[in-house]
Amino acid sequence: MSTSTQNIPWYRHLNRAQWRAFSAAWLGYLLDGFDFVLIALVLTEVQSEFGLTTVQAASLISAAFISRWFGGLLLGAMGDRYGRRLAMVSSIILFSVGTLACGFAPGYTTMFIARLVIGMGMAGEYGSSATYVIESWPKHLRNKASGFLISGFSVGAVVAAQVYSLVVPVWGWRALFFIGILPIIFALWLRKNIPEAEDWKEKHAGKAPVRTMVDILYRGEHRIINILMTFVAAAALWFCFAGNLQNAAIVAGLGLLCAVIFISFMVQSSGKRWPTGVMLMLVVLFAFLYSWPIQALLPTYLKTELAYDPHTVANVLFFSGFGAAVGCCVGGFLGDWLGTRKAYVCSLLASQILIIPVFAIGGTNVWVLGLLLFFQQMLGQGIAGILPKLIGGYFDTDQRAAGLGFTYNVGALGGALAPILGALIAQRLDLGTALASLSFSLTFVVILLIGLDMPSRVQRWLRPEALRTHDAIDDKPFSGAVPLGSGKGAFVKTKS
């Protein structure tokens, strides 16, 4: 940013086309959030109608996470090859169809499959929308682009909670899913009315199509074994989360098998930069493990342990969702001011002060509970708005959509594990204590992984010849790229 423009308000650095691109992607992400959280709102109703156990009911939330890794890979590769816009539109259509299918589901298995479809669409929407907006905005505003965009998901959750309080008591839980068909109309409008991302257009102008992650894995030398491993991973995840396995050793073994498969895919597609990709998956895994027990099971906690009626539940969830949305925007400003990683760590540390009081206060004062949730979610969940910017900075434009989509959505399996883990712990403790304990302890793991820039640090330890020293999105240096105590002079920009 030149010195002549430093005193101009940030929003004046954006032209009409950039604002239109953001608005379209933000609305798409709002609809994504609306569709995705519906199952959490009606989980108790679905559990009662289908006669499910608590763990089975929680697995319906998990189902959408199980398929996300493949959706992120497939639709991310589409975004790298054919453009961010087409991938974004396709993703919206996919999760809308899955939501409609939930409304018609006759039982557990059908709804589980519909949730798998939603997960694929959600994964594609996350990767394509994030890269679309980030690559359309100026470099010095890209934390804001990321944070503002992800706020749409939280706003969608708030809207869903309000619609839930109006629709479900009158028409039942299935009517809520029928509303999910509306995003398809929006997707058709998007296809004709938004431009392609600037970075992608510049990178691909007059050039041959890039070799995507799908090309490497499913059209390359090892395509047969990779296809087999894909089916094995899908089957293993199915048995882990929907197969009612009671043996913890078998579940752990299947989880380890999936980890080996995903690491294999990362090594094949990323070459010498695989340590960075693997560490990014770990960052996202623990980010979901600390945040999603609350996201997924908060409605159940409010309805069962605090005995709130649907209207009160909707009001409390408004505070929670609105806090997360505000936090995404605040995180964008903090990220552009302090730097992405420093802003992330500071916000998470502040959120730790509030997590215990949220679940210790009980249900006697709804307004105090709502305010505590607002600030805790603003600091703890909202900062995840800049996670796409953080991850995307480790990938070049040619592989950013698939790289972001795959690493994020493999790590998002933590979101599949989180509600089940919370439900299992709640069998020994009350649900509120289980949620507070999980969130408080696992947040510190994320603080260490991001604060120490472990993706760059592990890359430097294992494959230093492929080390990237600067963020590919905003050109700022990675702190983990040089040994501690080396000083700023050690940062020499490299291309990789």
UniProtKB/Swiss-Prot annotation:
Swiss-Prot/TrEMBL catalytic activity: N-acetylneuraminate(in) + H(+)(in) = N-acetylneuraminate(out) + H(+)(out)
Lineage: superkingdom: Bacteria
Pfam families noted in UniProt: MFS_1
Compartments where located: Cell inner membrane
Gene3D superfamilies: MFS general substrate transporter like domains (1.20.1250.20)
Regions crossing the membrane: 22-42, 58-78, 86-106, 116-136, 148-168, 170-190, 224-244, 247-267, 278-298, 313-333, 353-373, 374-394, 406-426, 431-451
InterPro entries named among the record's database cross-references: MFS, MFS_dom, MFS_trans_sf, SA_transporter
Chief subcellular location: membrane
Keywords: Cell inner membrane, Cell membrane, Membrane, Sugar transport, Transmembrane, Transmembrane helix, Transport
Entry GO MF terms: carboxylic acid transmembrane transporter activity; sialic acid:proton symporter activity
GO annotation, cellular component aspect: plasma membrane
SUPFAM superfamilies: MFS general substrate transporter (SSF103473)
Family as reported in the entry's similarity comment: Belongs to the major facilitator superfamily. Sialate:H(+) symporter (SHS) (TC 2.A.1.12) family.
Role this protein plays: Catalyzes the proton-dependent transport of sialic acid.
Protein name: Sialic acid transporter NanT
